[in-house]
Structures are given as structure tokens and as C-alpha cells.
Regions:
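Hydrophobic targeting segments
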Residues: 3-9, 25, 38-44
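Short beta-strand/loop segment that forms part of the nucleotide-sugar
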Residues: 36-51, 82-83
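Active-site-proximal specificity loops/subdomain of glycosyltransferases
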Residues: 52-101
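Conserved catalytic core of nucleotide-sugar-dependent glycosyltransferases
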Residues: 114-116, 120-210
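Short beta-strand-to-loop acidic/aromatic patch adjacent to the donor-nucleotide binding site
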Residues: 102-112
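Short, well-formed alpha-helical segments that are part of the catalytic scaffolds
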Residues: 14-30, 56-57
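Active-site beta-to-alpha loop of glycosyltransferases that engages the nucleotide-sugar donor
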Residues: 8-20, 48-50, 87
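C-terminal catalytic/acceptor-binding lobe
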Residues: 184-193, 205-297
Length: 297
């Protein structure tokens, strides 16, 4: 039996989105059975250097209370960060992949998904070995680089349909699933937190370097490093579930209490710093892999 860990990182301003996500997650867990071993790891990040609690009208306890009631009956190893030990979702992923699970699902708080999604992903993942990724499909995303993941019913739609059409956006929750084809794509393409499932061996292989810090482009790094490995003959599979899609919620992003907390927004600073190191990290990974590859007898 494969053990699966679902990893979600929650900032205070995301608690309302996360509550909506958990409604779907509770439904999704109802389709699990005795052959499934699925655990949630949700990190509520109340780091005082990411939120100015002294200047915030509502305090940490408010979020702890809202958070704590969301998991009744769901197996979890959740954590609440009250100090400066966690700086973002990239760090949470880096720490999570070291835990003794066979595979991981990374999911952002703004993801809208069908209640059957988890069941479909698990069923496909149980048939795979080695390094693999199992992705939902997407309605037409930003540009043609995402075409490999496009749901078969949306291939002729304009780019941006997932963001511009609210019926499509929120339809992710109630979409009619007519058929699903688990198809392998010839490359790697994923958004790290798009309810994407990864084998532990994939992240052990490419890693999430410390240099990417608390918040950075670990998805780009993982994709590009994986592509290098595939060119050298390493077997990394990405399977797309063509027939069931996810979207991001571009509408309900601002919480009702937004004027009552004072975020200290370091995401751009963290991302820019990490992104500036990204190419060198990929080159370093490629160099080591090529050296290892050419050294083989």
C-alpha cells in the first residue's frame, strides 16, 4: 500500500479560501477505502515576520481557532507556525518530501477541484513505479506551453478560458466527468501546487534546493531538471488525467477581514532572490548528472 501525503501551506489571508478547499477535501476523503493511506499535512503559517501581529486587529488565536475545526475525521500531521521556523510554501514542500511517504500531492489554497479528483489520481498512481507525476487536466490555460495538460473538451477554447470564464472556473467543482484518459506526455509540465501528485523518488532525485528559500520557483526547477534527466535517458513519467480538470479561484481571493490584518509581503523579494539562482541551480544539477552519466562504464 502506497502512503500519500497531501501538503498545503496556508497564510492568514488564505484561511477563507482554505475553508472552502476543505469542504471539497472532506468530500474527496469519503471515496477512500481500506486500500488507501492518505494523510494531510497542512501548515498554518503565522510567522510574526510575515504578518505584523502587533499592528493587526485580529490576532493569531483567531486563525488557530478557525483552522483547528476543519479536520474532524481526517488523518493529519498538521502544524501551526507561531515562530520564524517556516518562510513559505517552498520550504514546506522541501521539509515534507523528507517524510516517510511514497508520494505527495501539493495543493495551493486557491485550487478548485472535483471531489472525485483524489480518487482518480490515487488509482492511477498505484499502477506506477519509479519516478512519476500524475496531473489533473486544465481548461485552456495562459498560453500554449500548457497545451499538453488541456482537457479534451477545451482544446479549441481561447487561451485564458480558465481565468476569464467564471462558469468554467467554478464548474471545476461540479463538472460532468464523461470519460478519463490517463495519457503520458512526452515532457514535464506542471504547476507545483495544482493538486499535482508526485512520487517521492522524483523529488528525491531532482530535490528542492535550499537556495530556493522559503518561497521560490521549485516547480520550474523541478521541471527543467527533470527534462535534463529525461534527455540523458532517465525514466520520468508524467501522466495527465484528461477528462477531469482543476482551476484556480481568481475571484474570491480577498478575505472579509483583509483590513484587520497587516501582512508583511516578502513573496516578491523571496521569489526574485530564488529565481535569480534558478538557472545556476539547474546548470549545476545538469553538470553533475552529465558527469555521472558519462562516468558509467
Amino acid at each position: 500500500m502506497k502512503k500519500t501525503l497531501i501538503c498545503i501551506h496556508v497564510m492568514p489571508s488564505e484561511i477563507e479560501m482554505f475553508e472552502r478547499l476543505m469542504i471539497q477535501m472532506h468530500k474527496a476523503f469519503q471515496y477512500l477505502n481500506e486500500n488507501d493511506d492518505v494523510t494531510l499535512k497542512v501548515t498554518l503559517n503565522l510567522n510574526p515576520e510575515l504578518t505584523d501581529w502587533k499592528e493587526s486587529e485580529i490576532k493569531q488565536g483567531y486563525f488557530v481557532s478557525r483552522f483547528g475545526v476543519l479536520f474532524n475525521g481526517l488523518k493529519n500531521i498538521n502544524e501551526v507556525i507561531l515562530d520564524t521556523s517556516c518562510w513559505g510554501t517552498t520550504q514546506q514542500k522541501r521539509e515534507s518530501i523528507k517524510l516517510p511517504y511514497d508520494q505527495f500531492i501539493f495543493c495551493d489554497t486557491d485550487i478548485l477541484f472535483h471531489e472525485h479528483m483524489l480518487r482518480y489520481q490515487l488509482d492511477v498512481s498505484y499502477q506506477l513505479n519509479g519516478m512519476y507525476i500524475v496531473s489533473p487536466s486544465l481548461p485552456k490555460w495562459w498560453d500554449n506551453s500548457w497545451d499538453y495538460l488541456t482537457h479534451y473538451e477545451y482544446k479549441d477554447k481561447p487561451y485564458g478560458t480558465a481565468m476569464d470564464d467564471k462558469d468554467v472556473m467554478f464548474g471545476a467543482l461540479t463538472q460532468e466527468i464523461k470519460q478519463i484518459t490517463a495519457r503520458q506526455i512526452p515532457t514535464l509540465k506542471f504547476g507545483c501546487g495544482m493538486h499535482t501528485l508526485y512520487s517521492k523518488s522524483f523529488w528525491e532525485f531532482v530535490t528542492i534546493p535550499d537556495e530556493l528559500g522559503g518561497y521560490g520557483p521549485e516547480d520550474t526547477y523541478g521541471m527543467e531538471s527533470g527534462k535534463v534527466a529525461m534527455k540523458l535517458g532517465y525514466d520520468i513519467k508524467q501522466i495527465v488525467l484528461d477528462g477531469v480538470y482543476i482551476t484556480e479561484d481568481y475571484v474570491n481571493r480577498t478575505p472579509k477581514f483583509s483590513d484587520m490584518i497587516k501582512p508583511i509581503d516578502k513573496k516578491k523579494e523571496f521569489y526574485d532572490t530564488a529565481n535569480s539562482k534558478g538557472q545556476e541551480l539547474i546548470k549545476s544539477f545538469a553538470k553533475k548528472l552529465i558527469e555521472k552519466h558519462t562516468a558509467k562504464p
